[in-house]
Amino acid sequence: MVFADLGRRLNSALGDFSKATSVNEELVDTLLKNICTALLETDVNVRLVQELRSNIKKKINVSTLPQGINGKRIVQKAVFDELCSLVDPKVDAFTPKKGRPSVIMMVGLQGSGKTTTCSKLALHYQRRGLKSCLVAADTFRAGAFDQLKQNAIKARVPYFGSYTETDPVVIAKEGVDKFKNDRFDVIIVDTSGRHQQEQELFAEMVEISDAIRPDQTIMILDASIGQAAESQSKAFKETADFGAVIITKLDGHAKGGGALSAVAATKTPIVFIGTGEHINDLERFSPRSFISKLLGLGDLEGLMEHVQSLDFDKKNMVKNLEQGKFTVRDFRDQLGNIMKLGPLSKMASMIPGMSNMMNGMNDEEGSLRMKRMLYIVDSMTEQELDSDGLLFVEQPSRVLRVARGSGTSVLEVEETISQVRVFAQMAKKIGGKDGILGKLGGNPAAALKKDPRQLAAMQKRMQAMGMGGGMPGLNPGSMNFGDISKMANMLMGGGGPGGAGGMDFSGMLNQFQNMQKPPRRR
């Protein structure tokens, strides 16, 4: 991944700083030297690195810093804030709204990934309830319309283009007018890739802009082009005056610092980042979340948004859990949900501390193992799917049949059944009349408020089930009754039986953040 090496080096510099017994001028200078060297070797502009160093030094007065961990935290916070400022021009980007047509024009260099990103962006807005569409106004590159057409069909997004018309201004105007009449919310116009030396194409870009009058112009910036990104971005800014940037190809191995320099030089916000070639590989950009992931501190907000965008079907499982049941079918549904989340390394980078633990782990191996588990459960009968796995314990011949039918080993089938059995036992302790939820009357928040003594009993049961280890960053001592009550309500989606529509992820996130200590760097 782009910036992976930068993240490791920044982590290492902050880790060495944290190990020191006391904070002094020499220690701070060493930290800043290591950080600046890492940024320079990633192609970040020298002027920006000098500004970052100067700003950190202004914020830190070593002579007045408290000794020990508090002094270190002040220095670490200053570093974190300045790294955020590096990628945050503090300019609000345009946001499309439902019921009002918004025209977005995409510009950028040839080969930067504009056409693919157009489809990703249309799908992103469509999933959030906005009617999205695409206009293919790239008549310069052979096959551009065909590529956009294929991507649009895959994303199930309406599109407009022409095989006969060669004037991109005419195509763009006709497409935008058509979709405005059809009351679309987001109209994304794909234009030809162009270089700053190609004055004719730059003039064409201005003509298209004058014809369609976009609400927002977005520049697609390839993370791999290095220090040339700054000069190219300035040329586009002067001509098209783009209001936002999408950085693509962040799944590669280029340095990527040039793209960050371009953002700082043009004072334009990054709105999204492309993390892969697939249609779902587009992430909303948040400066603090980006730097947090870079330093190995995770991005819970991004994780929750990603989970919510996938629209998991949880109704059947929630209903079964309330009754104290967990079936093989529930297990299969959850496997499918996990695979929708994407590569394990991507998820790990969003969870504090997990990115370091994932070093050396192979995404392909993890994905293959989950696929083989799906093969196993897909080879079962309806009766077996609706069981809690006990059927296989009572009739071992079923294990051999499923192994043969799925092309897996008997051991793999037994391991899968064992996992289902573990979840089934947990479900019994959680649901039903005699379970945790049953004793809380189906509404955890209300029951705990009525009788706080049940909180202690619930904690003991969860510890006995191996669920009392806590979450990284949570301070159990700081959790009060109000925190537990709110979280319990969120876990049930805001209600008891009949009203449980799934977890309130954003609410849970806010509650976790309120209870978190400042993260420790080791």
Curated annotation (Swiss-Prot):
GO MF annotations in UniProt: 7S RNA binding; ATP hydrolysis activity; endoplasmic reticulum signal peptide binding; GTP binding; GTPase activity
Spans annotated as G-domain: 1-295
Annotated catalysed reactions: GTP + H2O = GDP + phosphate + H(+)
Quaternary context: Fungal signal recognition particle consists of a 7S RNA molecule (scR1) and at least six protein subunits: srp72, srp68, srp54, sec65, srp21 and srp14. Interacts with srp101.
Gene assigned in the entry: srp54
Pfam families membership: SRP54, SRP54_N, SRP_SPB
Family designation: Belongs to the GTP-binding SRP family. SRP54 subfamily.
Enzyme Commission code(s) on record: 3.6.5.4
UniProtKB keywords: Cytoplasm, Endoplasmic reticulum, GTP-binding, Hydrolase, Nucleotide-binding, Ribonucleoprotein, RNA-binding, Signal recognition particle
Function: Signal-recognition-particle (SRP) assembly has a crucial role in targeting secretory proteins to the rough endoplasmic reticulum (ER) membrane. SRP is required for the cotranslational protein translocation for ER import and preferentially recognizes strongly hydrophobic signal sequences. It is involved in targeting the nascent chain-ribosome (RNC) complex to the ER and is proposed to participate in the arrest of nascent chain elongation during membrane targeting. srp54 binds to the signal sequence of presecretory protein when they emerge from the ribosomes.
The record's note on its domains: The NG domain, also named G domain, is a special guanosine triphosphatase (GTPase) domain, which binds GTP and forms a guanosine 5'-triphosphate (GTP)-dependent complex with a homologous NG domain in the SRP receptor subunit srp101. The two NG domains undergo cooperative rearrangements upon their assembly, which culminate in the reciprocal activation of the GTPase activity of one another. SRP receptor compaction upon binding with cargo-loaded SRP and GTPase rearrangement drive SRP-mediated cotranslational protein translocation into the ER. The M domain binds the 7SL RNA and the signal sequence of presecretory proteins.
Disulfide bonds: none
Segments for region (M-domain): 296-522
Residues noted as binding GTP in the record, renumbered to the chain: 108-115, 190-194, 248-251
GO cellular component: cytosol; endoplasmic reticulum; signal recognition particle, endoplasmic reticulum targeting
Location(s) in or outside the cell: Cytoplasm; Endoplasmic reticulum
Taxonomic classification: Eukaryota, Fungi, Dikarya, Ascomycota, Taphrinomycotina
Protein name: Signal recognition particle subunit SRP54
Organism: Schizosaccharomyces pombe (strain 972 / ATCC 24843) (Fission yeast)
Signal peptide: none
GO biological process: SRP-dependent cotranslational protein targeting to membrane; SRP-dependent cotranslational protein targeting to membrane, translocation
UniProt xrefs under PANTHER family: SIGNAL RECOGNITION PARTICLE 54K PROTEIN SRP54, SIGNAL RECOGNITION PARTICLE SUBUNIT SRP54
